[in-house]
């Protein structure tokens, strides 16, 4: 396994440019699992779980809420927690240290906007599903 990591590191060092694809696995490694009915979800969204039977973030994003107010209560809490209160963690910081000096472009389905705060150039990050911070009611 260690040899594999050395080979990957060497390939990164020798590459002229990098195309980085990032999806839920990266967020999960940072502790944000949109599929999980975990401690974090129950702590921050337990009221939505009790009231509507929502068991994870993904269900909450696509749930048919009875009112716009209840829908935006969920969305605004999610945006506040994941995009403003929680900062990117060591996985994102290490990724930037590993590749940030290279010519790169990132394509991601992650919407929590954790690439730019660690140093990645916003113009080199394409969030194909948008950014939660750009949501509008």
Which residues fall in each region the model found?
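Conserved catalytic core of sirtuin-type NAD+-dependent deacylases
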Residues: 1-137
């Amino acid at each position: 396994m260690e040899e594999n990591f050395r080979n990957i590191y060497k390939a990164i060092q020798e590459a002229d440019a990098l195309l980085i694809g990032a999806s839920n696995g990266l967020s999960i490694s940072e502790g944000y699992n949109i599929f999980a009915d975990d401690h974090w979800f129950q702590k921050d969204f337990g009221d939505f779980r009790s009231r509507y039977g929502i068991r994870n973030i993904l269900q909450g994003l696509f749930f048919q809420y009875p009112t716009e107010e209840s829908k935006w209560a969920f969305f605004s809490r999610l945006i506040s927690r994941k995009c403003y209160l929680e900062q990117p963690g060591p996985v994102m910081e290490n990724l930037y240290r590993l590749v940030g000096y290279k010519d790169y472009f990132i394509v991601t389905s992650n919407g929590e906007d954790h690439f730019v705060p660690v140093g990645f150039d916003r113009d080199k990050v394409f969030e194909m599903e948008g950014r939660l911070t750009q949501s509008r009611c």
